[in-house]
Amino acid sequence: FYGSLPDGKVKTFSRGGSDSTGSSVARAIHADVYENWTDTSGVLVADPRIIKDPVVIETITYRELRELSYMGFSVFHEDAIFPVRREGIPINIRNTNKPEDKGTWIVESTCQKSKYVITGIAGKKGFCSINVDKDMMNSEIGFGRKVLQAFEDNGISFEHIPSGIDTLTVFVHQD
C-alpha cells in the first residue's frame, strides 16, 4: 500500500499500513464492521510455524489483540486498532482463501467465558531482560520507581516489567 506526501512524492506504508488504512476508512465511513481479509482464518492461539494446528480464537478484545500483536502476532498491526476502537466498530479477521470460515471477532469487551485460560501465545525476538533480585523488595516503598528512574535517567524505555515478591525483571529492546 502507498499514498502520496503533500509534495506529491509517493510513500509506501510500513508493515501494517493496509490494516491502518482499512481501519481509518472504516471509521471515516462509520462502518458497522471492519472486515480484514488475510491468509489465515482469524487470529490463532499460537504461531502455526511453531505449534501444529493452532485453534482459531473466536472472539478477542481490542486490548488482548493489541498486546498479542505487539508481542509478535503478525495477523493485524497493533496500532490499526485505535481508529475503529474509538468508534466502537468491531473487527472481523477473515481468510480470503476460505471465505466460509467465520474468522475472529475483535470487540471492546466480551461476556463470553473463554474455553481456555490463556488467550494466545506470542513471541518476539530482540529483547534483553535485566533481572533484579532483592529480599523483601516488596516491602520497600518506591523500590520499583527507583529501578525505573535509573532507566529513565539513561534514556532507556522499557517494554514489560513482571515482578514477584523478591524479584523484578525489566525487558528492553536490545538495540
PLM features: what roles do these ranges have?
Residues 1-175:
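C-terminal catalytic "cap/lid" subdomain
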